[in-house]
Amino acid sequence: FARGISRTADLVFDLRFLPNPHWIDELRPLTGNDVEVRAYLSAEPAWSETLDRIESLLIDWIPRYWAAGKSYVTVAFGCTGGRHRSVAAAVEMAERLAGAGFAPNVRHRDLASPPRDTIERHPGRASASEGEDELNR
């Protein structure tokens, strides 16, 4: 959410607890649309568990939103840079929901943004960049 949380979403899911592909050199220039990034994320057990729970929730809640008079539901997935985890989650969830009879549309808000180490927090560091780390000591 380094570029801000979605202001139009009905539901927002924070995926920053999952491993960040940004810190894998081969994956950094790729996005969540790439099979390599999706394979990396799928290897993490929490990935499937998380998406399974979100899918179950959405399959239950979306019809309830419709029954309340909403014609659509906006679901946002967030991570730090908006290029890997959130993109992969949106794509996979759209596939799952389509398989369940829904008609999802996917829009990636931050996909075109360049990767930046200054907004990513490396595992084990107290701050986002070495420079910040030095300033905070």
Model regions: which residues?
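C-terminal accessory "lid"/substrate-recognition subdomains
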Residues: 1-75, 98-100, 110-137
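Catalytic cysteine-centered active loop of the rhodanese-like fold, especially the PTP/DSP P-loop
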Residues: 71-94
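Post-Walker A helix-loop "phosphate-sensing" segment adjacent to the P-loop in P-loop NTPases
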Residues: 94-104
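A structural preference for short, hydrophobic beta-strand core positions in alpha/beta folds
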Residues: 106-108
